[in-house]
């Protein structure tokens, strides 16, 4: 009997040890699985104007330091925590101000307010070499920083970079595809009207410019297939500081002009002086009633995807009636 009791006791102890071992194994397995399921912060590398930058995770607190970059983020569904002030508006362009509520102003494109940027504790800063190259190292010390190269001409180049930087490359492709479809549709609707020569002039404080093809609006006109007057059919930006002797170079089948006003009233006075000049009144576009004043923010200053689409709205409305 004693021997049987000893055997039973030994078996009971062995059973408990086996159960305990199984329990430990399950806990370790569960723990290992838990470790596997724990989220990892993926990183990606962006090549840009200043080199390469590694970004961890999808940025949630983005500071943008160009006007066209602000439009890019908004089109991608990203509301920045900070942005540079618009060149016109207080502080944002009229066509984006409803989307910018709560966004902090961090200076202008040049100069930006580095201290204000740091206070926002961004996880990504997007800027531009042309505007902010000298402070790149300061910005990089605050957060991962990506710079575009230039601000002139084709807006899509910078847009694609910004989309990659905020980890929304696919969304960016959709935005561009939608825009390209608008270009194709409008071009088809206009038909032979794109053969009309389109002239563009800008009035600024102390400066009058005749715009060529490598400008924001010039690129869009070319995408639609519009002809340009011989004096403007050039692959550079613009003729700056034009004198009144150059007014004949402003002629075209249709003339669009836009005025950048800095609040001094100087540009508006310059505009009035020039459009009332006998040489200007003698332009064929004036005589045929084909001169149109358009919004400078849309046709030039903002320079982004939202402005590009609004410029298409203007062209559709005006040119379909020609």
Name every feature range the model reports, one short phrase each.
Residues 23-26:
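Bacterial signal peptide processing site
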Residues 17-21:
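C-terminal motif of bacterial Sec signal peptides marking the signal peptidase cleavage site
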Residues 61-73, 173-227, 231:
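Basic- and aromatic-lined ligand-binding clefts that recognize polyanionic substrates
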Residues 69-116:
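A short, structured surface patch at a secondary-structure boundary
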Residues 90-92, 132, 149-161, 197-219, ...:
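Extracytoplasmic ligand-binding site segments that recognize negatively charged/polar headgroups
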